[in-house]
Amino acid sequence: MEIRTATPADWPLIWPFLRDIVAAGETYTWPRDVTEEQARKLWMPPAPARTVVAVAPDGAVLGSAKLAPNQGGPGDHVANASFMVAPAAAGRGVGRALAAHVLDAARADGYRAMQFNAVVATNTRAVELWRSLGFEVIGRVPEGFRHPARGYVDLLVMHRRLD
């Protein structure tokens, strides 16, 4: 698997799994009916943000990640990242590989920390992955997410230093 900067030509390969993940309504705070145009603007924003893809040897896009400042101005030294793995590639280490790549990129860009603002507490695979990579839960929004099957569940704020 290769991880590289996403190009506009990758979008048609990202959109189908991104659309399905968001429409499921279980892990992202985006509108479940997000349009392709809205999603492209959110997922592939201009610099200083960057988007990467994990690509199989056959050219299939297995997953994608976005790295950006968590806040602007005096808060721009803390990074934020988002990750989506194609369901067909789940359990194959794609998320971990994307995370390692993004953490390295954030360090290289001079970020001092990384923060995830809204990790759905019932997304246990993600929570376990982030904990294994040194992230800690530093905050909790009680019932901050409407899960389609589980009702109101907590959102976690997760953080780790990069220096």
Regions found by a protein language model. Name each.
Residues 2-14:
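A short beta-loop-alpha structural element at the N-terminal edge
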Residues 8, 31-88, 99-100, 105, ...:
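Acetyl-CoA-dependent GNAT
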Residues 11, 16-33:
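Helix-loop element at the rim of GNAT/NAT acetyltransferase active sites that forms part
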Residues 85-88, 92, 120-122:
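Active-site acidic-Proline motif in GNAT/NAT acetyltransferases
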Residues 91-108, 127-132:
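Conserved acetyl-CoA-binding loop-helix of GNAT-fold acetyltransferases
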Residues 106-119:
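Conserved GNAT acetyl-CoA-binding A-motif
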Residues 116-126, 144-146:
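Conserved beta-strand-loop-alpha-helix junction that forms the acyl-donor binding cleft
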Residues 131-140:
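Conserved acetyl-CoA-binding loop of GNAT-fold acetyltransferases
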